Amino acid sequence: INEIMAAVHQKHPNVIFYGEGWDMKTELTKPDVRLAVQTNSAMVPGFGFFSDTIRDLLRGTTFESTAPGFVAGAVVPKEALEACFMGMPSWAAQPNQCVNYASCHDNTTLFDRIALTAPEAPVETRIRMNNLAAAFYMLSQGVPFLQAGEEMLRTKPGKHGGFDDNSYRSPDSVNSLKWVTLDKPEYQDVLSYYKGLIAFRKAHCVLRLSTREDVQRCVHPVCCENEHCVAF
């Protein structure tokens, strides 16, 4: 990975490298080979890794489709949420190696997942849950990542009802962005909210600290007695 990054950056210095840093050894993995996984981030400086921790805490575990996360009212470990906001110091050598997100190409979209975990909630409440997830990962230390269309409440309807959580072979009717939804004011409001989050992050350098030392010096959790509250 280091050789690949060095070769590409010789001609294209602005290319960003990131990926899924899961430790997925197979029978072909040599025992003396160190893999480019989250826990080895210090060995691949400049390479970013998806944070499955922030994803699962915000929306619910990937391995149980109806399990709620923090944004749907579940009580989750505050220490884990605080670590996410600070760019996962347990494995990310530098904050820019932690890629924060709530949805990507795999699994259900964020809004679909919220529909599964909060089926009785009105749409207005689900939208607020969606926006809470976006605010948390976009304002956390690290690199924010959002799936195309999340800013317009992207959904992937299933062929036989429900939602498609593995759409790599699904048709355009599932994977396309439904631009017509932007005709509705509530969808435009979400789009504006995402734009505002991005602008706010760009405007405040303290949300984009570049070293682990800077994060430790500038970002501190604030004690909240409410189990549903985290503050910094």
Cite the ranges covered by each PLM segment.
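Active-site-proximal helices and loops of the catalytic beta/alpha 8
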Residues: N2-A93, E150-G196
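Loop/helix patches that line or flank the sugar-binding groove of alpha-linked glycan CAZymes
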Residues: P95-F232
